[in-house]
């Protein structure tokens, strides 16, 4: 608001000057804020002096009073009172605000005292005027824009007073602030009214100008009251008590309903302006002024208890107000005049009632009807129609334009559950809901056709109808929820459901008209799935880089003895990552390195994430490690790599600083360790290189482009001569970029190999795709079947360059209802088919596949594809990615009338800010991103705030808070929730968790500091019959009997992870259970119950005492087991495991780690289908290794199982570099701290050090010299199969005490560097 240019300039200069100084005390900052507050109000009051009505309305002449202040300071009064304010007051304040001291305190107190006394004099003479304006006098100088700006300024200053709760602040107002908040609301509503009138009036009229003047007068008197009386400057010099201020505001509120103009009541001003607007509606400007605030204005003035009809009117107005907030202008463009007419009629009715009520106390609605000439009951009908229309439009505009076709399945399941749980609430809709349920069941075959026949001749019509059906499913869900929560009146819900039934009937007629069901339904019975279900695995082909690969391979294996970096750089899409991965996974390269690890950086990265990724590859994944500080993780990585020859892949580095962060973790021990680095920038590549010059990837030539396209489309087959010409033309369009070629190859690979189809691809691509990857992605997205579009866009919820675990991704898809069910197939299997199809189209990159069955284990998206997903998902109103840099704030998003179906957050404070404005959101995913700049207290605040605000997302189906957040309580109000993953702080779960009757995936973790005791689950958990995957570490149940009785009720449960069972001798596992992970109880060493689950496929046991008999009995009950993992298991006193014929007949993977096993006897026909055997053992003898080798021989030679893989992790020893004699005790210390070391012995006479143990990549090596380590002696175990090694030491000081060492060191010079090199054995497949 720029009322006075001179004052505005002063304020700006003052702000500039104060902002340049950063070191303000709290007192100084409060003074500065207070001065600005006073300056703004003075600006408002001074400007009002220029209006002609000021003197008539009782406005005080502030300028004259300011002259008196000048005289009191014995300063010649300037020609302008404002100039004095600037020279005397403002300059003094600026001078004393920066570094307040005793003298400045006195100066400020003096200034404050003068101003306060001046205001006292103003208050003594000021009162609300009884007569304001002369009759029929028009004031042409009142501008609506100025009125709104003035009100905004007053509202802004009042907001400051409401927010300050610190008694020491100069802005503090003691006592309750309800009066101020009420005045604020009145001013905001007045502003809405002014905005509405100014937007709708087509030409100046007396009524409008009078109304603007009236609004300005009301706002100006509020400004005067506040400026003269508030704030009270802390607790000092309070000459005005808080109750007096409240009385002043009460007088103001009462004044609003008194006459302010002779012969014309306040309400008459509103009536006249509304009548004037009503007469101009046909010619009104086409502006969207029907904001929720203008509906709030008459609603706010409705009296309670007038009549049933008025109560209904109030209810409808509230609905209109609440839904207008979500409605864009385009959805109302044909209804604006009707909307305006409804609002004006309601306003006339309400204000006429007040006007007549003032003249006649017993005024009735009939009197108002006669006076206004319209019938209220009849006029309520168009209001109802408008309310219903706005509610529908508001809901429709928030629906995404991309849907998962599984939503119809989700609705049908919920309809049955809702009608059972909420039968009383839904009784009046029972018949309509049954009709809807029948209609959706009849449409299920059609939706199945859409998924399984994507290339049907009616593809476009089928997909359009399918999307309409799913939109209707969303509407039904919303209506049912509104009925249960009583958020919408019954008349509206009944009308809405009836319209839905009619619209579904129209959709069915459209389907039948084209015979889409009759033509294709016959094929559905015999076809179990189309090629969309699964596509052959795509290999990452590299064409044209063979010479480069061979050259880089030589540099990796040979070259300098020291560490070296191979940098690959080039523009996006050239294949840097593909080339680097090809080298990183090359067996001839990997076999030469002890450790291989990789990480992907990206433009926005987390240092901790990079360290964790590298540590995961080197020493395995461990959740505890995530809570360690960065410096400890970096030190752990460095010490792990120190004794080994390593190969590291660092992908997508953007800046030199990233390399600076990481290079210290990669020690150079002259053992030919290598690092592969990819980047887009030549400067980064050059900066990281040591001996080898950076490699710049070139673009393909036309011949290479065609070969690459041909390879990606046809694989090992050759292209038909008929397609060669058009294929080469398509390859040329790709601009010689490998990435573009890969994307384009995904389009014709899903089509018939016919010239017409390929010509269509070429025509659709056109010439616009040169150097424009987004255009290619857009075309690839355009040809996707509708059921795959939502799955593809959902990748926008993940961070850039983050490896995505398929198990989590597929469960999210299922929970989001993206997957359409099919009889005879599990949802996971169908979802895998969807994913394989996206991979086959080259839209998703596979980063890891399972060794056993070749299924995708992890994946990721190329940067270009991820960027497309984020932008397109936002455009389709599907998913909004929210991070710290997002300019759009939640309130601006709400008032732009747009909510998204799914939200992905990178930071917890974003989630808190958006929670209040996202009621329609269906999923919230908080991605992994660390915020080290947050204090612990701030984290606790956000944890609590998120927990408190989660119920605002009442339609949530997915809530994934696995990273960062530790919630204080479980949001049991979210009845639609299907996927819930979070960290919790409690040691017990409340029984109210049963209210979450929809979850299929429940994953609860706890921070390390609260894991000292098991998590206590209520017995109601076992009544959550829809659970399919339960992940809760270290849990037990409060009611053993309930567990025994109800555990089998979880018919759909497929995964039960890490239960902490302690004392159950019998346990009935759910019949469909497929994954079971059990950890040992503190109370029992053995498993006290028999594991009986006929469909179990994956079993992991950790920490138990087992024997051959128990495993044999278990095998009899687990005929379908495919994966068995035994960790830290002891085999009784004899340490023996006998495996008989026929045990675990379907077992494919057997993994044994850290077993206490001396003898392993395996029958020849045991494990007939075994594909992979992984052994990492302790306290074992050579018989165990021999048994493993026999299994391999049986599988490969007898069973002809050429894919069988045996991995033996044998005993390893450590490699140490000693620079001088002083490092010997450090070597002892290091060895004793390595968890795999079993014995260290020394022989002083023979001058040798013998080390025996299992030192693998997980060793934690720590330096430090202690007397205990120097003198330590460990007895070598009798086990003979250990891989022992003798290390000769040239030093004759071994075993000497510290004093003797010092004496000898003085008598001789320091010896030359000695190096102890120990080869590490094991780890590679035999």
From Swiss-Prot:
Amino acids binding ATP: 570-577
Molecular function per GO: ADP binding; ATP binding; metal ion binding
Residue windows of the LRR repeats: 953-978, 980-996, 1027-1050, 1053-1070, 1071-1094, 1098-1118, 1119-1146, 1167-1191, 1208-1230
SUPFAM superfamilies for the chain: P-loop containing nucleoside triphosphate hydrolases, RNI-like
Biological process, per Gene Ontology: plant-type hypersensitive response
HMA domain ranges (all copies): 1209-1278
Pfam families: NB-ARC (PF00931), NB-LRR (PF12061), WH_DRP (PF23559)
Mode of membrane association: Peripheral membrane protein
Keyword S-adenosyl-L-methionine: no
Subcellular localization, as worded in the UniProt entry: Cytoplasm; Membrane
CDD domains: RX-CC_like (cd14798)
Top-level division of the source organism's lineage: Eukaryota
Keywords, in A-Z order: ATP-binding, Coiled coil, Cytoplasm, Hypersensitive response, Leucine-rich repeat, Membrane, Nucleotide-binding, Plant defense, Repeat
NB-ARC domain span: 611-864
Keyword ATP-binding attached: yes
Any one Gene Ontology cellular component term annotated for this protein: cytoplasm
Coiled-coil boundaries: 421-444, 536-558, 749-770
Note from the entry: This protein is encoded by the haplotype B genome of the allohexaploid Solanum demissum.
Entry function: Confers resistance to late blight (Phytophthora infestans) races carrying the avirulence gene Avr1. Resistance proteins guard the plant against pathogens that contain an appropriate avirulence protein via an indirect interaction with this avirulence protein. That triggers a defense system including the hypersensitive response, which restricts the pathogen growth.
Family of this protein: Belongs to the disease resistance NB-LRR family.
Protein name (Swiss-Prot/TrEMBL): Putative late blight resistance protein homolog R1B-19
Organism: Solanum demissum
Encoding gene (name): R1B-19
């Amino acid at each position: 608001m720029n009322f006075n240019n001179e004052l505005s300039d002063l304020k700006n200069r003052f702000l500039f000057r104060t902002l340049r100084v950063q070191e303000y005390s709290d007192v100084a900052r409060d003074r500065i804020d207070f001065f600005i507050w006073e300056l703004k109000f003075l600006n408002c009051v001074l400007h009002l002096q220029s209006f002609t009505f000021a003197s008539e309305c009782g406005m005080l002449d502030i300028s004259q009073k300011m002259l008196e202040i000048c005289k009191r300071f014995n300063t010649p009064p300037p020609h302008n009172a404002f100039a004095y304010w600037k020279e005397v007051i403002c300059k003094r304040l600026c001078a004393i605000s920066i570094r307040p001291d005793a003298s400045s305190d006195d100066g400020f107190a003096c200034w404050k005292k003068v101003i306060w006394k001046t205001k006292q004099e103003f208050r003594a003479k000021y009162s609300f005027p009884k007569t304001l304006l002369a009759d029929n006098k028009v004031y042409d100088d009142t501008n609506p824009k100025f009125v709104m700006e003035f009100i905004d300024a007053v509202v802004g200053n009042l907001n400051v007073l409401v927010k300050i709760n610190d008694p020491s602040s100069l802005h503090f107002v003691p006592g309750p602030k309800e009066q101020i908040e009420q005045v604020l609301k009145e001013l905001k509503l007045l502003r809405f009214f002014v905005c509405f009138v100014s937007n709708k009036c087509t030409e100046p009229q007396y009524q409008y100008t009078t109304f603007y003047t009236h609004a300005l007068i009301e706002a100006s008197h509020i400004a005067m009251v506040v400026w003269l009386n508030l704030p009270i400057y802390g607790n000092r010099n309070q000459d005005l008590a808080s109750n007096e201020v409240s009385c002043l505001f009460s007088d103001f509120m009462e004044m609003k309903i008194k006459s302010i103009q002779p012969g014309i009541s306040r309400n008459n001003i509103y009536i006249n302006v509304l009548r004037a607007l009503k007469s101009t509606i046909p010619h009104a400007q086409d502006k969207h002024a029907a904001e929720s605030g203008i509906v709030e204005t008459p609603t706010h003035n409705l009296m309670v208890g007038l009549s049933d009809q008025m109560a209904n009117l109030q209810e409808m107005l509230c609905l209109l107000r609440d839904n207008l907030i979500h409605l864009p202008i385009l959805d109302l463009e044909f209804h604006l005049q009707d909307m305006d007419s409804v609002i004006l009629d309601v306003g006339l009715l309400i204000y006429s009632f007040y006007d007549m009520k003032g003249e006649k106390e017993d005024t009735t609605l009939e009197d108002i009807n006669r006076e206004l000439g319209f019938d209220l009951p009849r006029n309520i009908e168009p209001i109802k129609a408008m309310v219903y229309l706005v509610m529908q439009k508001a809901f429709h505009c928030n629906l995404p334009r991309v849907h998962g076709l599984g939503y119809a399945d989700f609705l049908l399941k919920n309809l049955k559950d809702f009608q059972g749980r909420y039968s009383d609430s839904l009784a009046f809709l029972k018949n309509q809901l049954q009709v809807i349920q029948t209609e959706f069941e009849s449409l299920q075959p059609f939706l199945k056709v859409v998924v399984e026949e994507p290339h049907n001749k009616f593809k476009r019509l089928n997909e359009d109808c399918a999307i309409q059906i799913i939109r209707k499913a969303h509407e039904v869900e919303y209506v049912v929820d509104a009925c249960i929560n009583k958020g919408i009146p019954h008349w509206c819900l009944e009308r809405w459901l009836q319209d839905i039934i009619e619209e579904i009937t129209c959709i069915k007629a459209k389907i039948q008209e084209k015979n889409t069901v009759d033509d294709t339904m016959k094929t559905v019975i015999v076809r179990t799935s189309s090629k969309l279900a699964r596509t052959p695995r795509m290999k990452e082909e590299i064409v044209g880089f063979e010479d480069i690969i061979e050259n880089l391979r030589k540099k990796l294996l040979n070259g300098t003895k020291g560490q070296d970096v191979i940098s690959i750089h080039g523009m996006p899409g050239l294949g840097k990552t593909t080339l680097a991965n090809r080298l990183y996974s090359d067996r001839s390269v990997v076999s030469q390195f002890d450790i291989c690890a990789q990480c992907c950086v990206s433009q926005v990265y987390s240092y901790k994430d990079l360290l964790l990724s590298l540590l995961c590859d080197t020493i395995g994944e461990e959740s505890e490690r995530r809570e360690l500080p960065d410096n400890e993780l970096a030190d752990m990585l460095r010490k792990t790599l120190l004794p080994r020859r390593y190969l590291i892949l660092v992908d997508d580095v953007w800046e030199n600083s990233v390399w600076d962060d990481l290079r210290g973790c990669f020690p150079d021990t002259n053992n030919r360790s290598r690092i592969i680095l990819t980047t887009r920038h030549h400067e980064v590549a050059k900066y990281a290189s040591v001996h080898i010059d950076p490699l710049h990837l070139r673009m393909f030539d036309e011949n290479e482009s065609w070969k690459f396209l041909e390879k990606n489309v046809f694989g090992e087959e050759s292209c038909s001569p008929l397609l060669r010409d058009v294929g080469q033309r398509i390859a040329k369009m790709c601009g010689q970029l490998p990435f573009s070629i890969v994307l384009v190859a995904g389009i014709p690979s899903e089509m018939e190999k016919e010239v017409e189809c390929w010509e269509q691809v070429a025509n659709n691509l056109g010439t616009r795709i040169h150097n424009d990857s987004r255009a290619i992605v857009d075309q690839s997205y355009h040809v996707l079947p509708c059921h795959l579009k939502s799955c593809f866009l959902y990748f926008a919820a993940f961070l850039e360059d983050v490896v995505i675990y398929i198990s989590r991704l597929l469960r999210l898809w299922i929970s989001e209802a993206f997957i359409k069910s099919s009889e005879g197939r599990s949802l996971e299997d169908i979802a895998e088919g969807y994913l394989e199809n996206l991979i086959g189209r080259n839209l998703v990159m596979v980063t890891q596949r399972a060794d056993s069955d070749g299924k995708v284990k992890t994946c990721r998206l190329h940067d270009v594809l991820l960027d497309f997903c984020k932008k397109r998902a936002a455009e389709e109103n599907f998913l909004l990615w929210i991070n710290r840099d997002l300019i759009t704030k939640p309130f601006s998003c709400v008032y732009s009338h747009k909510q998204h179906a799914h939200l992905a957050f990178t930071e917890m404070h974003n989630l808190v800010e958006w929670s209040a404005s996202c009621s329609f959101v269906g999923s919230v995913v908080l991605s992994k991103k660390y915020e080290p700049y947050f204090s612990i207290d701030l984290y606790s605040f956000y944890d609590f705030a998120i927990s408190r605000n989660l119920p605002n997302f009442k339609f949530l189906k997915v809530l994934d808070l696995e990273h960062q957040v530790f919630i204080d309580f479980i949001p049991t109000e979210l009845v639609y929730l299907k996927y819930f993953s979070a960290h919790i702080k409690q040691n017990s779960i409340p029984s109210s968790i049963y209210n979450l009757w929809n979850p299929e995936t429940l994953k609860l973790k706890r921070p390390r500091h609260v894991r000292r005791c098991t998590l206590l689950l209520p017995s109601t958990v076992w009544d959550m019959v829809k659970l399919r995957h339960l992940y809760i570490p270290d849990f037990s149940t409060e009611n053993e009997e309930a567990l025994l009785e109800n555990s089998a009720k979880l018919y759909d449960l497929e995964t039960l992870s890490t239960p902490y069972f302690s004392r159950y001798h019998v346990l009935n596992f759910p019949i469909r259970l497929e994954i079971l992970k059990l950890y040992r109880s503190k109370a029992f060493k053995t498993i006290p119950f028999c594991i009986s689950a006929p469909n179990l496929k994956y079993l992991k046991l950790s920490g138990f005492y087992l024997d051959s008999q128990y495993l044999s009995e278990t095998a009899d009950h687990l005929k379908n087991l495919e994966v068995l993992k035994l960790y830290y298991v002891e085999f009784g006193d004899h340490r023996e495991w006998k495996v008989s014929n026929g045990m675990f007949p379907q077992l494919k993977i057997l993994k044994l780690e850290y077993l206490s096993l001396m003898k392993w006897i395996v029958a020849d026909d045991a494990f007939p289908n075994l594909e992979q055997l992984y052994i990492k053992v302790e306290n074992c003898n050579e018989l165990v290794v021999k048994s493993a080798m026999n299994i391999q021989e049986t599988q490969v030679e007898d069973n002809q199982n050429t894919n069988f893989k045996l991995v033996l992790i044998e005993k390893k020893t450590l490699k140490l570099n000693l620079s001088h004699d002083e490092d010997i005790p450090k070597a002892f210390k290091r060895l004793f701290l390595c968890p795999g070391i079993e014995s260290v012995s020394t022989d002083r006479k023979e001058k040798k050090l013998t080390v025996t143990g299992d030192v693998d990549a997980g060793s934690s090596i720590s330096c430090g010299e202690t007397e205990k380590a120097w003198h330590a002696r460990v007895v070598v175990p009798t086990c003979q199969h250990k891989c022992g090694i003798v290390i000769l030491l040239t030093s004759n000081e071994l075993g000497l005490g510290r004093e003797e060492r010092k004496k000898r060191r003085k008598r001789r010079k320091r010896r030359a560097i000695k190096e102890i090199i120990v080869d590490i054995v094991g780890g590679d497949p035999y």
